[in-house]
A protein has these predicted regions:
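Boundary segments of small protein-protein interaction reader/adaptor domains
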Residues: 1-234
Length: 234
């Protein structure tokens, strides 16, 4: 982890009578996404987005807006910012662990955002003890965490000499694969053998993320440099 990294939050990893102070870090680096702005072609002037009321075509300021849920065609119930705020989960600095399960029992399809957990002041020894225990037992911790007013399911697992935390999707958010309706197809032993040979030909010892780079991003960056120099992009 880079020395200049700053924790997102200070939390407590708790289960039973155990409470481990931890610092939460994002596992991904700040996005270096290339952003394009919308301009007027004739003079390069920036354009801005405005909101217009469908009923009368008049401009609507943000201060005049509320959120609404469409419960029937063209019919809405409105919620103020205060009403929505009141529905949020109570703020908590705890990651409440409810159970320990084999890591392989958690399907990767449920994985969302990933974070790193580091020991906070006074938490080094229990943090190390939990890490080593999870490594030895090949288990992961499943719990709940409230972030930005919403409760999330999380999995805490050992990673190298520390802990990583994955935010999970709720079951209702994941489309069952069986809904695709993929039927069974008969294949011969010869076809299966040939497919196995193709896999063996491309088989590697393990996944190396360094082997893959964002080539599209590289092309866009090169094109931007050419444009700045006044060159045409073909």
């Amino acid at each position: 982890m880079a020395k200049q990294s700053r924790p997102i939050a200070s939390l407590t990893l708790s289960f039973g009578l155990v409470a481990i102070p931890v610092k939460l870090y994002s596992a991904t680096l700040p996005s270096e996404r290339i952003s394009f702005h919308l301009l007027r072609q004739k003079d390069g002037s920036r354009v801005k987005e405005q909101y217009v009321a469908v009923a009368d075509g008049k401009l609507v300021e943000r201060s005049e807006m509320v959120k609404g849920y469409e419960f029937a065609k063209g019919k809405y119930v409105m919620f103020s910012a205060g009403e929505i705020k009141a529905l949020e989960d109570e703020h908590s600095t705890a990651i409440d662990i409810g159970e320990f399960v084999p890591l392989e029992s958690v399907d990767p399809v449920y994985f969302g955002s990933t974070y790193y957990l580091a020991p906070d002041k006074g938490g080094a020894k229990p943090y190390a003890l939990l890490t080593m225990t999870l490594q030895k037992t090949r288990q992961c911790a499943v719990g709940r965490w409230v972030s930005r007013g919403k409760e999330h399911i999380v999995v805490v697992r050992p990673l190298e000499d520390g802990l990583a935390m994955h935010q999970l999707h709720f079951q209702a958010e994941v489309r069952p694969f069986k809904d695709l309706g993929i039927g069974r197809v008969k294949v011969s032993d010869a076809e299966l053998k040939l497919a196995g040979q193709l896999v063996d030909h491309l088989k590697a010892k393990g996944f190396d993320p360094g082997e893959y780079v964002d080539e599209y991003k590289g092309r866009v960056q090169a094109a931007i440099k050419d444009k700045i120099k006044g060159h045409a992009v073909s």
